[in-house]
Design a protein with these regions (language model features):
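Iron-sulfur cluster-binding electron-transfer modules in prokaryotic oxidoreductases
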Residues: 1-299
Length: 299
C-alpha cells in the first residue's frame, strides 16, 4: 500500500454540523496507517449546486484557492463530502482541460499572491479506500464482521457525475465500488428502489425548496424500509444531514415515525474494525442508531 498522506479538506457540514463523521474518518484512516494533514486557511469548497449556478467565477476562484493550499502542502486532497469533491474535482479537471479556466484561475489567484499549477489530485474518501488501500487489504483490518446487517447503500450524485470527470472505471450508471466497500465489513448491500436517486438536498433544493427536498428524502427512506434495510449507508456529509436531520423534519411535516439509522461509511467500517460507537461519533446522529447497535451486539 505504501505511505499515504493527504491534505484533509473538511468542508463546512462535517466539522460544524456532524463532527462525528470527521472523527470517524480520522480514526479509521489512522488505523489504516493513512496520515491526514489539516489544510490551514481552507474555506467552503464552495457549494457546487448554489455558488456555481449563480456566480461561476466566484465558484472557480474560491475552489482554486483551496486547491492552491493543498498544492503548497505538496499533498493530494481527500474529502468526505461529495459536494466538496464535486467542486474541487471539477475545477481541477477543467483547469487541466480548458485554457479559459486556467486563465481565470491564474488571474484570481494572482490577486492574493497564490497560484495553482495542477500538480495535485482530488480524491474522495471512498476513492482512497477502494483504489489506494484496496478491498483485499481492508479485509485484513476487519475484527468484528457485521454479518447480520442489511444495508441500503446510497451513492449520491456528485461522487458519480459528471461521469467524464470521475475515476470510476466501471462507469457511473450502475457502479459497484461502494457496495463492495460496504460488504468488506460483512454487511449485506441490498437492492432497493431508486438506489441511485438524489437524497433530495443537492443542487440548492434543500435551501430553496425544502418541501421538495423532504418529499424526495421521504420516498428514499420508504424504499429503504420496504427493502428490509437495517440502515442507510452514505459517504457524503450533506447526504448524511439530509437523511438524518431530514427524518426529524419529515416526521414533523408528514406525521410519520421514521427512525431509520443513518450511517456514514467510515462509521460502518470503524465498527467492523473494532472501534467503539463513541470513537466513531455515532451518538451525535439525530436519529438513534441504538437499534442497529443492539442488532450487532455492540454496547
Amino acid at each position: 500500500m505504501g505511505e499515504l498522506r493527504f491534505a484533509f479538506f473538511l468542508g463546512c457540514i462535517m466539522p460544524n454540523r456532524y463532527p462525528g463523521l470527521e472523527a470517524s474518518v480520522r480514526r479509521v484512516f489512522e488505523k489504516l496507517g493513512i496520515e491526514l494533514v489539516d489544510m490551514k486557511g481552507a474555506s467552503c469548497c464552495p457549494a457546487p449546486g448554489v455558488v456555481r449556478s449563480f456566480k461561476f467565477d466566484t465558484w472557480v476562484a474560491l475552489g482554486a484557492r483551496n486547491l492552491s493550499i493543498a498544492e503548497e502542502m505538496g499533498l493530494d486532497i481527500v474529502t468526505g463530502c461529495s459536494g466538496c469533491y464535486g467542486t474541487l474535482r471539477d475545477i481541477w479537471y477543467e483547469h487541466r482541460e480548458k485554457k479559459e479556466i486556467r486563465d481565470k484561475v491564474d488571474y484570481y489567484l494572482s490577486q492574493i499572491g497564490k497560484s495553482f499549477k495542477g500538480k495535485i489530485k482530488v480524491k474522495h474518501v471512498l476513492e482512497v479506500l477502494h483504489f489506494d488501500v484496496g478491498v483485499e487489504k481492508l479485509k485484513e483490518f476487519i475484527k468484528k464482521p457485521l454479518s447480520n446487517i442489511k444495508a441500503a447503500v446510497h451513492y449520491g450524485c456528485h461522487i458519480l457525475k459528471p461521469s467524464d470527470k470521475r475515476p470510476w472505471k466501471e462507469g457511473t450508471e450502475k457502479p459497484r465500488f461502494f457496495d463492495e466497500l460496504v460488504e468488506v465489513t460483512g454487511a449485506k448491500s441490498i437492492n432497493w428502489k431508486d438506489k441511485f436517486m438524489c437524497c433530495g438536498a443537492g443542487g440548492g433544493v434543500r435551501s430553496g425548496a425544502l418541501d421538495v427536498a423532504l418529499h424526495m428524502t421521504k420516498e428514499k427512506i420508504e424504499n429503504a424500509y420496504a427493502s428490509g434495510a437495517d440502515c442507510i449507508v452514505n459517504a457524503c456529509s450533506f447526504c448524511h444531514l439530509q437523511f438524518d436531520t431530514g427524518q426529524i423534519e419529515i416526521n414533523k411535516s408528514y406525521g410519520t415515525s421514521f427512525n431509520m439509522p443513518i450511517i456514514y461509511y467510515t462509521q460502518l467500517l470503524g465498527l467492523a474494525m473494532g472501534l467503539s460507537p463513541e470513537e466513531l461519533g455515532l451518538h451525535q446522529n439525530n436519529v438513534s442508531v441504538e437499534p442497529l447497535l443492539r442488532k450487532l451486539g455492540v454496547n
